[in-house]
């Protein structure tokens, strides 16, 4: 048995008889009691090292990315060059559907960074649509009657047609309501060298809306912060006036992309808020939902 079968499907070996045990003992004595050397894997490594580069790349591409970076590149100089090179990571990207199989091979130099960024790509904001009330949000300011989570479309509102999974929104009141989230990029899996050298694009998006029966104000502020929370880059929408509109009341997207922001970014602070313009008791202020922060490959 070569050990490649399913352990549960392999039968238990029968116990040797006393006569067979005696014969095995005699055979060991005849061999001088020498033990058979165990394969330490050097033979397999030597065999792999003899493979043509295209075949070796395909073998390496089957391994987990962390194992490639942490172990395989330490085996020898040739493997280090392959792991650090673009072809291996382009192949992994193609195998995992991150880029088309027949896509161009020379448009991007840093396929390793592209791979890791693509695998981590997700909305870094928690609870962007109010499914968990205000869970995940900090520095919450409850002006007027405070924030309230409402079901779409809400009174004098419209459905959110841009994403069918969005079912709720946050409604502000007759004085400024604000809330924020602070994203720890290193805790989310983005290491210092990647942030400082590659400086991947950071894309911020938010959606806001008013009511058809009341005008309102909306504002978005996003800051890129250092380890000590110094502001390294900032975007501010200013106060956006949303007029009452009996014919529309639709949702508007606001977005900003941070690039070339320099080394040292460790945190992202996302803050938005709103209020109404008529000072009516209740929740006639700006509505927000589907907020997002993405680190793009």
From Swiss-Prot:
It holds the Pfam family FBA. Residues 16-27 have a biased composition (Acidic residues). The record marks 174 as: Important for carbohydrate binding. The keyword Aminoacyl-tRNA synthetase does not apply. Residues 45-92 form the F-box domain. It is found in: Cytoplasm; Microsome membrane. A carbohydrate binds at residues 211-213, 279-280. SMART domains: FBA. It is a peripheral membrane protein. Keywords: Cytoplasm, Endoplasmic reticulum, Lectin, Membrane, Microsome, Ubl conjugation pathway. GO terms for cellular component: cytoplasm; cytosol; endoplasmic reticulum; membrane; SCF ubiquitin ligase complex. One of its GO terms (biological process) is ERAD pathway. Residues 1-42 are annotated as: Disordered. It comes from the Eukaryota. Residues 114-297 form the FBA domain. Component of the SCF(FBXO2) complex consisting of CUL1, RBX1, SKP1 and FBXO2. Predominantly detected as heterodimer with SKP1; the heterodimer with SKP1 is not part of the SCF(FBXO2) complex. Substrate recognition component of a SCF (SKP1-CUL1-F-box protein) E3 ubiquitin-protein ligase complex that mediates the ubiquitination and subsequent proteasomal degradation of target proteins. Involved in the endoplasmic reticulum-associated degradation pathway (ERAD) for misfolded lumenal proteins by recognizing and binding sugar chains on unfolded glycoproteins that are retrotranslocated into the cytosol and promoting their ubiquitination and subsequent degradation. Prevents formation of cytosolic aggregates of unfolded glycoproteins that have been retrotranslocated into the cytosol. This is F-box only protein 2. It comes from Bos taurus.
